[in-house]
A protein has these predicted regions:
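M16 family metallopeptidases and their MPP-like homologs
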Residues: 1-52, 57-106, 124-133
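In a subset of proteins, long, contiguous C-terminal domains/tails are tracked
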Residues: 107-139
């Protein structure tokens, strides 16, 4: 939607994990001439594809490299280590995961991702929020 269709000037996603539950959040900023409903259709098509076909080997390798790099960089500071220990205690009651969690992430397979996407990334399991300019006009 950013590089090929050019319906959004920016797009991204992230996971917001919480103690009781979490969210997978997708954001996109439309170009002035892009209709919000059209952009939502494009995003929906992309998210729906996660549950239909496995990610490619290249995509999985890219994500694993990013996870490992982020984890190593985060462990370079006392604050990063403290935050990781606090998170592991809050979510798992196990600070020892600081030594093994990155390996668990790196062991995830394409099939694991496909199974999770089919379970959690369904149309019935989402909330859509659209922010429009102050004047209320999409274009």
């Amino acid at each position: 939607i950013v590089y090929d269709k050019k319906t959004a000037k920016s797009a991204g996603s992230f996971i917001w994990d919480n103690e009781v539950g979490g969210m997978f959040i997708v954001t996109a900023t439309a170009f002035k001439n892009t209709n919000a409903d059209s952009l939502l259709e494009d995003i929906t098509r992309i998210v729906d594809s996660f549950g239909k076909e496995p990610v490619t080997d290249k995509e999985l390798e890219k994500v694993k490299n990013s996870v490992e790099n982020d984890y190593i960089n985060n462990m370079q500071t006392i604050m990063g280590k403290a935050d990781a220990l606090a998170s592991f205690w809050t979510f798992h009651k196990n600070t020892g995961l600081i030594n093994t969690m990155v390996d668990e992430y790196l062991s995830i397979t394409k099939e694991d991702i496909l199974k999770a996407a089919k379970k959690y990334l369904t149309r019935d399991n989402r909330v859509v929020i659209t922010y429009l300019p102050k004047n209320g006009k999409e274009n």
